[in-house]
């Protein structure tokens, strides 16, 4: 039989809060063309992501991937730390 590979959704964003235990808030920005005006605008959304070792801090750029529901608001996990925040 053929193996079925599951496609995992990944997003890249900036950590805006690390005050919770094993959880970070990640701000993901995307650029969208306005349907009427035609201007390119920035839209953003915040995701709560699971950070098992509490290694991400505010300002870091991280890659998150979709996972099973871990709590009421948390369904993403931090898969990779892309860049540390410049202090």
Swiss-Prot record:
Q: Which keywords describe this protein according to UniProt? A: Ribonucleoprotein, Ribosomal protein, RNA-binding, rRNA-binding
Example GO BP:
translation
Top-rank taxon, per record: Bacteria
A single GO molecular-function term is: rRNA binding
The protein's matches in InterPro entries, at most eight in alphabetical order, are given as: NA-bd_OB-fold (IPR012340), Ribosomal_uS17 (IPR000266), Ribosomal_uS17_bact/chlr (IPR019984)
Gene3D superfamilies noted in UniProt:
Nucleic acid-binding proteins
Query: Which SUPFAM superfamilies is this protein grouped with?
Result: Nucleic acid-binding proteins
UniProt keyword annotation of Cell division present:
no
One GO cellular component term: cytosolic small ribosomal subunit
What the protein does?
One of the primary rRNA binding proteins, it binds specifically to the 5'-end of 16S ribosomal RNA.
Per the record, the similarity remark reads: Belongs to the universal ribosomal protein uS17 family.
Q: How does it assemble?
A: Part of the 30S ribosomal subunit.
Name the chain's protein. Answer: Small ribosomal subunit protein uS17
Q: Can you name the source organism? A: Thiobacillus denitrificans (strain ATCC 25259 / T1)
Q: What is the lineage of its organism?
A: Bacteria, Pseudomonadati, Pseudomonadota, Betaproteobacteria, Nitrosomonadales
């Amino acid at each position: 039989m053929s193996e079925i590979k599951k496609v995992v959704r990944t997003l890249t964003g900036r950590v805006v809060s690390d005050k919770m235990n094993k959880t970070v808030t990640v701000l993901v920005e995307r650029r969208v063309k306005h349907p009427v005006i035609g201007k390119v605008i920035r839209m953003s959304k915040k995701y709560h992501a699971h950070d098992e070792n509490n290694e991400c801090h505010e300002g870091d750029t991280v890659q998150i991937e979709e996972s099973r529901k871990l709590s009421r608001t948390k369904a993403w996990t931090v898969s990779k730390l892309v860049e540390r925040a410049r202090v």
